[in-house]
């Protein structure tokens, strides 16, 4: 396909970073966001001052104010919006989608209230004939946008299509592996955010590196157990979208979910912690839905349960973190 073109839907930190990275190789990359004032600022400044300050846009990255034009321009649509707004975005873009479009989901989360995987939301709204891929992996926005080496995973049921898209999206700083396990990639991207909250809490009450490493390891086990019963390939969790994303999100200072956990452990209220982080915290948004899945599939997930008790039952942080270890004995 010589006329390859990409539109990224979502002009937050992650969507902007993906668009910047993709435009280092592709000449037709468009970025659209729902806030018109924000998009006009991006167009004027050639930089996302709010979410990724001091990172200038490549010349080949076009800022598009019109959703209709942004969708019609492209044969590849990448959705990078918070999970809470994912369904509404699909409904909005549906009338404008080109036939045989490649749809790539960069959102890490579950459908609110139901706990459904986002692939099921896509198939419900756009049909099961949709050529859907999932992109995930350890890829914090700032590092990706400035061109630091990054490895990600792209999943598609058709491995030939997956390899084609991965080749189009990757560049000398971004490597993208191709796999066919959509379920495993999604589960990894969801669970790691809650584990990162627990990791941050452990750091916030100074439990030490031994405890944090144990939480990460236990978290990988919970990810594996839920993924396996939902039909994922166990080897997916040993890769970039599993242990790779988990380790980064649990240990790096750029992690919103980890910051949120640290602040809660330091005594901040949930609302004040959310405000101080200043961005969407997917682990907080999705924990109820993860519990729905664990109950449905009869999977014991001690970390998920204990973080839930902190967030919704006002259980003290230290008690919950210690309970994680007690439940593992």
UniProtKB/Swiss-Prot annotation:
It is found in: Cytoplasm. GO terms for biological process: carbohydrate metabolic process; glycerol-3-phosphate biosynthetic process; glycerol-3-phosphate catabolic process; glycerophospholipid biosynthetic process. The active site is at residue 192. Its EC number is 1.1.1.94. The keyword Nucleotide-binding applies. Sn-glycerol 3-phosphate binds at residues 108, 137, 139, 192, 245, 255-257. Belongs to the NAD-dependent glycerol-3-phosphate dehydrogenase family. This is Glycerol-3-phosphate dehydrogenase [NAD(P)+]. It comes from Wigglesworthia glossinidia brevipalpis.
